[in-house]
Swiss-Prot record:
Keyword Transmembrane helix on entry: no
NCBIfam families reported for this sequence: aroFGH, PRK12755.1
Listed EC numbers: 2.5.1.54
Family as reported in the entry's similarity comment: Belongs to the class-I DAHP synthase family.
Lineage start: Eukaryota, Fungi, Dikarya, Ascomycota, Saccharomycotina
Modes of activity regulation: Inhibited by phenyalanine.
UniProt entry keywords in alphabetical sequence: Amino-acid biosynthesis, Aromatic amino acid biosynthesis, Stress response, Transferase
Enzymatic reactions: D-erythrose 4-phosphate + phosphoenolpyruvate + H2O = 7-phospho-2-dehydro-3-deoxy-D-arabino-heptonate + phosphate
Organism: Saccharomyces cerevisiae (strain ATCC 204508 / S288c) (Baker's yeast)
Function (record text): Stereospecific condensation of phosphoenolpyruvate (PEP) and D-erythrose-4-phosphate (E4P) giving rise to 3-deoxy-D-arabino-heptulosonate-7-phosphate (DAHP).
GO annotation, cellular component aspect: cytoplasm; mitochondrion; nucleus
Single Gene Ontology MF annotation: 3-deoxy-7-phosphoheptulonate synthase activity
Protein name from the UniProt record: Phospho-2-dehydro-3-deoxyheptonate aldolase, phenylalanine-inhibited
Record's note on what induces expression: By amino acid starvation.
Other comment: Present with 8970 molecules/cell in log phase SD medium.
C-alpha cells in the first residue's frame, strides 16, 4: 500500500519535498516467522560458519570456495544450480568448503537493475516487500542443500536474511563506508572486505581493523523499531583481492605484498589464512572467460605451498555469459540459468575449476609436509 506524499515538489517544505511517498515495510521478525529455517538448514549454516572460522585461523587446511551466479533472479534456476553444486561439494569436501554465492542486490556505478529484493518482477515496479518474501523463501530452501554467502549492501535487509548466511562480503564500493564497517562488527558470521575499486588494500585493512572493535550505531530491530545497537566486534574477517583500475592482484607477488601488509597491521600471522582471491571483476579484466586462468594461477601458488590463502570467489552459472533484461515484459523471455548482471562461467567450466582447486589444496598439503 503506497502512501502518497501530497507535499512532493513543494520547495517551501523543510523536508521530504523530494519524497514521492512511502510503502510500509514488513517487520523482519514477521517474515522470519513465516519462513523459518529448518533444523537441517540451521545445522548446515552453523557448521559452515565454524568451518570458515577454523580455516581463517589455520585449524582447517581446506580452501573456502564462494561460487555461484553474480546475482540470483530466478529461484527455480537457483535450486537447480544448488543441486548441482551440492553434489560436487560432497565429492570435494575433504579439500574444499564450497559455499554458494547467493547475492540478491547489485551495487551500481550508475543505474540498472538493482536485484531481486529491489525489483523482483524486473519491470521497475519495485515491489520490495515481495522481493524480501521471495528471497527469504528461496534462502530457507537453499540452506537445506548447502551453505550460502551474501553481500551486505545496506544495514536493514540483513535483519530479514542474515540468519541464512554462513559467510558475508562487503564490496569494493562500500568497504570504506563507516556504516558497513559498523554492520560487520555485529554480524554472526565471518565477513570479507574487498580492496578498493582502485586496487588499493588500505581501505580493506582499515575496515578489518574497524570491524574487530565494538560499535554503537542506529539500526532497526527484528520488530521493525529503530534502536541504538551495540556490537561486540567481529575478528573473523579476511581481505578479498578483486583487482582494480590499476590492474590485477591475484599473482604471487600481489599475494605476498598483501600478506606483509596484513601482518604489519596485526591482522594475521603465520598460522592464519586471511586472503581470498576473487577470480572475477578487476582480476578477470571483466571477461568471464579469464576466471579459469586466474584459478590456474591460484592453483600454482597452492602447489608451491602458499599458506596465506583462505579462499577463492568465482562467478558461475548453469549457462555461461550474460543477457540483458528485455525492455518490455520483465523476466519473460530470459534464457534459463544465465546471468542478467555480470557474465559468469558455465557449469562445465565450473566443475573443471573446482577439481583444479581441490587438487591445488592437496598439493599444498604435500608441499607443507616437506
Amino acid at each position: 500500500m503506497f502512501i502518497k506524499n501530497d507535499h512532493a515538489g513543494d520547495r517551501k517544505r523543510l523536508e521530504d519535498w523530494r519524497i514521492k511517498g512511502y510503502d510500509p515495510l514488513t517487520p523482519p521478525d514477521l517474515l522470519q516467522h513465516e519462513f523459518p529455517i529448518s533444523a537441517k538448514g540451521e545445522e548446515n549454516i552453523i557448521k559452515a560458519r565454524d568451518s570458515v572460522c577454523d580455516i581463517l585461523n589455520g585449524k582447517d587446511d581446506r580452501l573456502v570456495i564462494v561460487i555461484g551466479p553474480c546475482s540470483l533472479h530466478d529461484p527455480k534456476a537457483a535450486y537447480d544450480y544448488a543441486d548441482r553444486l551440492a553434489k560436487i561439494s560432497e565429492k570435494l569436501s575433504k579439500d574444499l568448503l564450497i559455499i554458494m554465492r547467493a547475492y540478491l542486490e547489485k551495487p551500481r556505478t550508475t543505474v540498472g537493475w538493482k536485484g531481486l529484493i529491489n525489483d523482483p518482477d524486473m519491470n521497475n515496479s519495485f515491489q520490495i516487500n515481495k522481493g524480501l518474501r521471495i528471497s527469504r523463501e528461496m534462502f530457507i530452501k537453499l540452506v537445506e542443500k548447502l551453505p550460502i554467502a551474501g553481500e551486505m549492501l545496506d544495514t536493514i535487509s540483513p535483519q530479514f536474511l542474515s540468519d541464512c548466511f554462513s559467510l558475508g562480503a562487503i564490496g569494493a564500493r562500500t568497504t570504506e563506508s563507516q556504516l558497513h564497517r559498523e554492520l560487520a562488527s555485529g554480524l554472526s558470521f565471518p565477513i570479507g572486505f574487498k580492496n578498493g575499486t582502485d586496487g588499493g588494500l588500505q581501505v580493506a585493512i582499515d575496515a578489518m581493523r574497524a570491524a574487530a572493535h565494538e560499535h554503537y550505531f542506529l539500526s532497526v530491530t527484528k520488530p521493525g523499531v529503530t534502536a541504538i545497537v551495540g556490537t561486540e566486534g567481529n575478528k573473523d574477517t579476511f581481505l578479498i583481492l578483486r583487482g582494480g583500475k590499476n590492474g590485477t592482484n591475484f599473482d604471487k607477488e600481489s599475494v605476498q605484498n598483501t600478506k606483509k601488509q596484513l601482518e604489519k597491521a596485526g591482522l594475521t600471522d603465520d598460522s592464519q589464512k586471511r586472503i581470498m582471491i576473487d577470480c572475477s571483476h578487476g582480476n578477470s579484466n571483466k571477461d568471464f572467460k579469464n576466471q579459469p586462468k586466474v584459478a590456474k594461477c591460484i592453483y600454482d601458488q597452492l602447489t608451491e605451498g602458499e599458506n596465506s590463502l583462505c579462499g577463492v570467489m568465482i562467478e558461475s552459472n548453469i549457462n555461461e555469459g550474460r543477457q540483458d533484461i528485455p525492455k518490455e515484459g520483465g523476466r519473460e523471455g530470459l534464457k534459463y540459468g544465465c546471468s542478467v548482471t555480470d557474465a559468469c562461467i558455465g557449469w562445465e567450466s565450473t566443475e573443471q575449476v573446482l577439481e583444479l582447486l581441490a587438487e591445488g589444496v592437496r598439493n599444498r598439503r604435500k608441499a607443507l609436509k616437506k
